[in-house]
Amino acid sequence: MTGFFTFLSFSLAALSVTNAAHILSVPKGAEVVPNGYIVVMKDDTSQQDFSSHRVWISSIHHNKTRRGLDGAGVKQTYDFDHLRGYSGIFDEDTIKDISNDPKVAFVEPDAIISQHVVVQQRKAPWGLSRLSNRRGGRNYVFDSSAGSGVWAYVVDSGVDIRHSEFQGRAVWGSNLVDNKNSDGTGHGTHVAGTIAGKTYGIAKKAKVVAVKVLNSEGKGPTSGIIAGINWSIRHARKHGMLHKSVLNMSLGGTYSAGLNHATAQAIKAGMFVSVSAGNDNINSNGNSPASERSVCTIAASTENDGKASFSNWGPAVDLYAPGHNILSARPGGGSQTMSGTSMAAPHAAGVAAYLIAKEGIPGNRACLRLKQLSQPTIRNPGPDTTSRLLYNGSGR
C-alpha cells in the first residue's frame, strides 16, 4: 500500500416531522393508498373533543361533495384507550386543515403492508452466505423486506449510480472533494454494492445516496469528511429519514477530535454509522473515525473465521465482518474483488439497513442489535478485541 495523506480508503485492492403542521412522511417510493391518510389525535384529547372534531371533518366532506369535489372522507375511526384517530381519503386542502387543528398529534400517509417471505440466494458471495449462517454455508438467507424503505449514505469516493446492481435505487447526493461526479477509484461503488447491490448486496432494496469525499487517489481532507457527514445528516433530516438511514465510511486517518465529534452527531441525530477499523494491523484507538466510541467500528475476517492479517484490532472494534476477497460491483459494469476493512464495514451497514426495515428499529439502535445477534466465532481476534462475527439473525 502507499502511504497515507490526510485520508485513505481502507482497501487493499485497487418517519419524522417534515413541517410545523405535523404531517409525517414515509420513505420515497413506498407504496401508499392514493390520497389516503391516517390521523392520530393527541393523547389528552377528550371523547367530547374527538366527537366534535369528527363532526367538523364530516361537515368539510359534505361541503366538498355538494360542490362536486372529489374526496371520500373518513373510512375508519379508531377510539382505543390511548389512541383516538381515523383514516380515510382526503385532498390536500383538507389534510392541511386537519393538521392545523391543535388537537391533532400527527397525520401520515396510509402505506401498504405486505406479507414477508424468506428468500434464499444460491451460490452467493461468501461474505453474504457467512453472515446469514451461524456455522457457515453456501447460501444467503434473508427476509424479503431486504432493506426496503431504508437509505444508505455512502461517504466515499463516489458511486456509479447507473450500475445495474442498483436497479435505479442509487442517486448522486453531494460532491465535497472535486468537480467529477464519478467514482475514480472503484472503491465507493464496491462498498455500495456490498450494502445494497442486487447480487452482491445485503439490503437489496435499500436506496443508495452517494456522498463523495475522496478523490481519484482515494484521499481527501478531514474537513471534507466532516462536511460529508454534515450534508448527510441535513439531507436525511430534510426527507424525514434520520431514523431509517445508515451511513458508511470505509476510510480513516490519524485521530481527529473534530471528525469523531462530527461522526457522533450523526448517531445522536438518529442514524446508524459504520466505519472501517483500518488496515495496519495495529490498535485502532489511534485512528479516526474508528476510535469514536458511539460508532460501529468493523474489523475484517477471512473465509475461515480468522482475523484478516491486515486488520486493525483493539477495544474500539465492535464486530468482525467479512473483509477478505470480497466480490462486488465495479464502475462501468461488472464486478471486482477487493480486500480490506473497507469491505467489512459495508457488510455491517447492509445488515443494519436490513434490520431497520425488518424489525423497525431506529438507526441509532442498530449497532446494539448487531452485537446482540453476533456470534463469538473469530479465532485470534487480537488483544482486547471482540471475537464476535456479524450475523443477520436468519435463524440458520
Swiss-Prot record:
Its main location: secreted. The active site is at residues 156, 187, 342. Residues 376-396 are annotated as: Disordered. Residues 125-396 form the Peptidase S8 domain. GO terms for biological process: proteolysis. Coiled coil: none annotated. Secreted subtilisin-like serine protease with keratinolytic activity that contributes to pathogenicity. This is Subtilisin-like protease 5. It comes from Trichophyton equinum (Horse ringworm fungus). The gene is SUB5.
